[in-house]
A protein has these predicted regions:
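A general alpha-helix detector
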Residues: 11-18, 90-94
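Conserved small/polar residues in nucleotide/adenosyl-binding loops
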Residues: 148-153
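C-terminal accessory nucleic-acid interaction domains of nucleic acid-metabolism proteins
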Residues: 116-128
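Amphipathic protein-protein interaction modules
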Residues: 69-116
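N-terminal interaction modules that seed assembly of large macromolecular complexes
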Residues: 2, 14-62
């Protein structure tokens, strides 16, 4: 498990969330388009980037990486209060902290965002994103949502 309360990880995850919202893209697609090198750059420079409003940083990243918009708008589809960018950044960061080793954080960021769990975390009409961090991490490890499975006999 990597270090808890990793500010660079929290900011990087929040920035990917902001990029997804700004571009109307799935967060996994944003991470895939940034690639490991792009995520590494954002992660390494998070202590500087966080000094500006996240919306401006997102605009700069969109320009720098020539990111194009999509048609995924989970905010418009939400029937309930939408969690803010920082809340979702914290959810992703905690999951990555729980499933990553200290030396492969950037690789794990890419793996988590591009995995099956991204669609569950991006569904703000479901209860998944605000489940306990241990539960979300175990679902990720098991590669399935454990919430609706029946207990073994």
């Amino acid at each position: 498990m990597c270090k808890r309360n990793n500010d660079a990880l929290f900011f990087t995850c929040s920035l990917i969330e902001q990029l997804g919202r700004s571009l109307h893209m799935r967060r996994g697609k944003v991470a895939a388009e940034l690639g490991e090198a792009g995520i590494q750059t954002l992660y390494r420079n998070a202590d500087i980037l966080h000094c500006e409003p996240i919306e401006k940083v997102a605009d700069d990243v969109i320009t720098e990486f020539s990111l194009q918009g999509g048609d995924f708008d989970n905010l418009a589809e939400a029937r309930y209060t939408v969690p803010d960018v920082w809340t979702m950044g914290k959810v992703y960061a905690r999951l990555i902290e729980d499933v990553s080793d200290e030396d492969n954080i950037v690789e794990t960021i890419l793996q988590v965002f591009t995995s099956w769990i991204d669609s569950l975390l991006s569904d703000y009409n479901a209860a998944f994103y605000y489940q306990p961090r241990d539960y979300i991490a175990e679902c990720y490890r098991q590669k399935t949502c454990l919430l609706y499975t029946s207990p073994s006999p």
